[in-house]
Amino acid sequence: MTKTIKEINRLLEAISELSDPYFIELESDDRVGVKKAVNKRRKAIQAMVDEELRLDKMLSYEKVLYQEGFSLIAGIDEVGRGPLAGPVVAACVILPIDCKIKGLNDSKKIPKSKHLSIFQAIQERALGIGIGIVDNHVIDDINIYQATKVAMIEAIKNIKGDVTEPDYLLIDAMTLETPIPQQSIIKGDANSMSIAAASIVAKVTRDRLMMDYEKAFPGYDFAKNAGYGTTSHLNGLKQFGVTPIHRTSFEPIKSML
């Protein structure tokens, strides 16, 4: 008896390999609906294969370190170097060996709608997470580059969880003054699972802070622009002036004082 397209779709959903013989069996079915269902499932499986390969590639730095005997590898990244207002936030995340988190990538490449679910997945699976926050006053005193380093060191010191002391650091494009062995990786948030996890944690943490600042200082659209120099933010500056969380060493704030 010929199966309905609905029945075929149900069977296709159970297939997870492109080499499954059921695909060959369906090639003789000329129904347009069947061909669409087959193509859709093949694309879905290929997407899963591609994602698995991408995640494997993102573990390449970690795998080298596993082979060298390191197991408590912390990824470190920051968010908030460029905004005109608010702190710079760093995160330090220690993931279990060979941990893969679906969808994890550089936070700038992930749709904002998915940030929270990936953040929650990191919280559930991480062995330890630390946060470092350096406010705008310190940024103005020592410059954003040095403030970023301070935030990263604070994140390491503040690790909480089952593991609080990493044995190796993978850092996004920075070198830190710490006795812990480390490696600086250019575009690390796109090439290391551990750094990408830190990127998301730092991003979600800072976004939440900026949403709180939106309530304290309405009119600058902080909840949406996170302190970056958007049109709405610049309009707020013209209308309401500089707030206590603005970076006075950054233009155009500096010229407004």
UniProtKB/Swiss-Prot annotation:
Function noted in UniProt: Endonuclease that specifically degrades the RNA of RNA-DNA hybrids.
GO MF annotations in UniProt: manganese ion binding; RNA binding; RNA-DNA hybrid ribonuclease activity
Disulfide bonding pattern of the chain: none
Residue positions binding a divalent metal cation: 77-78, 172
Family: Belongs to the RNase HII family.
Single GO BP term: DNA replication, removal of RNA primer
Domain RNase H type-2 intervals: 71-257
Record localization: Cytoplasm
The keyword Manganese is assigned to this record: yes
Cofactor detail note: Manganese or magnesium. Binds 1 divalent metal ion per monomer in the absence of substrate. May bind a second metal ion after substrate binding.
UniProt enzyme class: hydrolase
Reactions it catalyzes: Endonucleolytic cleavage to 5'-phosphomonoester
Gene3D superfamilies: Ribonuclease H-like superfamily/Ribonuclease H (3.30.420.10)
Top-level taxon of the source organism: Bacteria
Assigned EC number: 3.1.26.4
Gene behind this protein: rnhB
Protein name in UniProt: Ribonuclease HII
